[in-house]
UniProtKB/Swiss-Prot annotation, chain A:
Gene Ontology MF terms: NADH dehydrogenase (ubiquinone) activity; NADH:ubiquinone reductase (non-electrogenic) activity; quinone binding
Subunit structure: NDH-1 is composed of 14 different subunits. Subunits NuoB, C, D, E, F, and G constitute the peripheral sector of the complex.
Keywords recorded for this protein, A-Z: Cell membrane, Membrane, NAD, Quinone, Translocase, Transport
Region described as Disordered: spans on this chain: 1-34
A GO-annotated cellular component: plasma membrane
UniProt-listed PANTHER family: NADH DEHYDROGENASE [UBIQUINONE] IRON-SULFUR PROTEIN 3, MITOCHONDRIAL, NADH DEHYDROGENASE UBIQUINONE IRON-SULFUR PROTEIN 3
Entry protein name: NADH-quinone oxidoreductase subunit C
UniProtKB/Swiss-Prot annotation, chain B:
Originating organism: Streptomyces coelicolor (strain ATCC BAA-471 / A3(2) / M145)
Protein purpose: NDH-1 shuttles electrons from NADH, via FMN and iron-sulfur (Fe-S) centers, to quinones in the respiratory chain. The immediate electron acceptor for the enzyme in this species is believed to be a menaquinone. Couples the redox reaction to proton translocation (for every two electrons transferred, four hydrogen ions are translocated across the cytoplasmic membrane), and thus conserves the redox energy in a proton gradient.
Name under which the protein is recorded: NADH-quinone oxidoreductase subunit D 2
Subunit text: NDH-1 is composed of 14 different subunits. Subunits NuoB, C, D, E, F, and G constitute the peripheral sector of the complex.
Membrane-topology annotation of the record: Peripheral membrane protein
Length: 251, 440
């Protein structure tokens, strides 16, 4: 069975040379990239018979993977300076920087969480880097990315050098702790409270990590993927329209 | 406790005795301890001068604010979560409601993000981009008009409030003509625009520019040199460059410290690098400087609007890729805007494939390759950033808005503590927070 599937997969492998619209197809990354989920079936239907015929569909969802040198443009300069500055502090860059991703003209450093504060401080203070403005933190929940379910994503802007980079830090669901960046970027105070409120990421050493949007006694973390959207079916022109999270899903 | 002298190592003139004796600090501290006038006051969330449902928690000693904190979240509507359950196109309907005074900026930032994910950012037709810029600059005018009008009203200046809303009404009329709505437009869509400009729009905008060029000096005459206005605004809500950087404040708050940071100049999007305009700054770091900047930005926006009108050439307003372009052949019917009758006749009567295509695109939407991007636009309040993550599906996996109102509002404590209670209102008004954007 699995063999059959594999051969079918190979046969359907997109050939970018031939298929000009290959970039629009969802499975284009093939084996490259970082798998965050395996999608089976379609329309969100996973019980009952396979009436649609889509039940056997297997799709690997992959985010862009690590890039190799040269990254292009000023990316190499920033990466060199960061690695050099970390080395000066006696920190092996490979220990701090998990991987570097270049995608869609944006540079992302995946940072080990225990080194986040030091990396951020270096990025802020080093004259060659000087990322003085942090635009806050955004949480992302990848429930199927085992061991790295919760991601905190920071965008740092350098007004001095007119650059923008992204830092990404992950934490497992069972131990949702990420060090707080408030001591480096005070602007993250509210942003981290918001991310805690919605994702339950605990930012260690935050001065007052409390809920900010939801009521203080709220249960659960609303923007996690396992937290339901809620809603009730409504009647429209005689038909029952299901609540938004109950509607057919193509994702 | 401070030392009473500076040691020879710290000076070039030997030991220098300073006048900050330890006694004085002790006297002040014990006076503060003995004082029982300290009270905690809740201003809002239903206070007329707090810009919507914002709760300010002030610790007051007499007329002095010793500590100030914000309570927010009263307007949280879960827009980011809701986006994860709609198609990429439906997303614009939600994001336009975030900061409801800058709908076109929300839509544009979101759509630029989706287009970057799709990799079609260079395929957006010129006409669509120019209309986006046109609407964003009109929106900058209307947002600043509200900021100045409500800011004036909170000082008791009702005339400037009437002026501001009078002129904003002219802009809302233009919105209504173009999009059908005064707010919540959902007019900018991934790939382009929902529809082209209607006949008469360009003329009406030209008329408006003419009128606005006449009206703008009235604000100068009324407020800029007004001694009461200046007395209330100058040196109030002080936040310098270091404070702005630390607190992430952008927009007029940052530019009032003298730093000409404007994403339209530093990281141009939508072809802003080809427009001729200036970035006004002030060096006062206070509310008055922010007022002057907003006033000048409105003049600059009018310049950009005029340039947009001159550049408009007939052409498509949606990408050519039929897999993305929503079949937006819209027309105005007796029951409002909807699919044009010609289009319905075609898909229902003659082309089954067109019907299937229409149905798929409307119900299922288009797929966006898995990746993440961050796009930012310079909204009237500062850097409006959008972090969009796709998992390759027809719905956003995660959309996060970095709203400038949210970030700038954090600076409230730094601006207000140590000042007068009456100045809190001026300082908050100079940040121009909109709670729809703060709470999302």
């Amino acid at each position: 069975m699995s063999d059959a599937n594999n051969t079918a997969g190979d046969a359907n492998e997109v050939n970018p040379e031939k298929d000009l619209s290959a970039e629009n197809l969802p499975g284009q990354r093939g084996q490259g990239g970082e798998e965050i989920r395996v999608q089976r079936g379609m329309f969100g239907a996973n019980n009952g018979g396979d009436t649609s015929g889509y039940g056997g569909l297997v799709r690997s969802v992959r985010l862009p993977g690590p890039a190799s040198r040269p990254y292009g443009g000023w990316f190499d300069e920033v990466a060199d300076e960061l690695e050099g500055a970390l080395e000066e502090q006696g920190l092996l860059p490979d220990n701090a920087i998990e991987k570097t991703v270049v995608d869609r003209g944006e540079l992302t450093f995946h940072i080990e969480r225990e080194h986040l504060v030091r990396v951020a401080r270096t990025l802020r203070d080093d004259p060659a880097l000087r990322f003085e403005l942090c635009t806050g933190v955004s949480g992302v929940h990848y429930p199927h990315d085992k061991g790295r379910e919760l991601h905190a994503v920071y965008h740092l802007r350098s007004i001095t050098h007119n650059r923008l980079i992204r830092l990404e830090v992950s934490a497992p669901d069972g131990d949702p702790h990420i060090p707080s960046l408030v001591s480096v970027y005070p602007t993250n105070d509210w942003h981290e409270r918001e991310t805690y409120d919605f994702f339950g990421i605990v930012f260690d050493d935050h001065p007052a990590l409390t809920r900010i949007m939801m009521p203080d006694d709220w249960q659960g973390f609303p923007q996690r993927k396992d937290y339901p959207l809620g809603g009730i079916p409504v009647e429209y022109k005689g038909a029952q329209i299901p609540a938004p999270d109950q509607r057919r899903s193509y994702s | 406790m401070s030392t009473s002298h500076a040691s020879p190592r710290e000076t070039t003139e030997g030991t220098v005795y300073t006048v900050t004796g330890g006694d004085w600090d002790e006297v002040v501290q014990s006076a503060a301890r003995a004082d029982d006038e300290r009270i905690v006051v809740n201003m809002g969330p239903q206070h007329p001068s707090t810009h919507g449902v914002l709760r300010l928690i002030l610790e007051i000693d007499g007329e002095t604010v010793t500590e100030a904190r914000c309570g927010i979240g009263y307007l949280h509507t879960g827009i980011e979560k809701n986006l994860e359950y709609r198609t990429w196109t439906q997303g614009t309907t939600f994001v336009t409601r975030m900061d409801y005074l800058t709908p076109f900026f929300n839509e544009a930032a979101y759509c630029l993000g989706v287009e970057k994910l799709l990799g079609i950012d260079d395929q957006i037709p010129d006409r669509a981009t120019i209309i986006r810029v046109l609407l964003m600059e009109l929106n900058r005018l209307s947002s600043h008009l509200v900021a100045i009008a409500t800011g004036g009203m909170e000082l008791g200046a009702t005339t400037i409030m009437i002026y501001g809303f009078r002129d904003r009404e002219l802009i809302l009329d233009i919105y209504e003509l173009i999009t059908g709505l005064r707010m919540n437009h959902a007019y900018i869509r991934p790939g382009g625009l929902a529809q082209d400009l209607p006949p008469g729009a360009v003329d009406q905008i030209r008329e408006f520019v003419k009128k606005m060029n006449k009206n703008l000096p009235e604000y100068d005459k009324l407020a800029t040199g007004n001694p009461i206005f200046k007395a209330r605004m100058q040196d109030v809500g002080y936040l310098d460059l270091a404070g702005c950087m630390a607190l992430g404040a952008t927009g007029p708050v940052l530019r009032s410290t003298g730093l000409p940071h404007d994403l339209r100049k530093t990281q141009p999007y939508c072809g802003y690098e080809t427009y001729d305009f200036d970035v006004p700054t002030a060096d006062t770091c206070d509310s008055y400087g922010r007022f002057l900047i907003r006033l000048e930005e409105m003049r600059q926006s009018l310049r950009i609007v005029e340039q947009c009108l001159d550049r408009l050439q007939p052409g498509p307003v949606m990408v050519a890729d039929k897999k993305i372009a929503w079949p937006a052949q819209l027309a105005l019917g007796p029951d409002g805007l909807g699919n044009s009758l010609d289009h319905i006749k075609k898909i229902m009567g003659t082309s089954m494939e067109a019907l299937i295509h229409h149905f798929k695109l409307v119900t299922e939407g288009f797929r966006v390759p898995p990746a993440q991007v961050y796009t930012a636009v310079e909204s009237p309040k500062g850097e409006l950033g959008v972090h969009v993550v796709s998992d390759g599906g027809t719905r956003p996996f995660r959309v996060h808005f970095r709203d400038p109102s949210f970030t700038n509002l954090q600076a409230m404590a730094a601006m207000c503590e140590g000042g007068q209670v009456a100045d809190v209102i001026v300082a908050v008004a100079s940040i121009d927070p909109v709670m729809g954007g703060v709470d999302r």
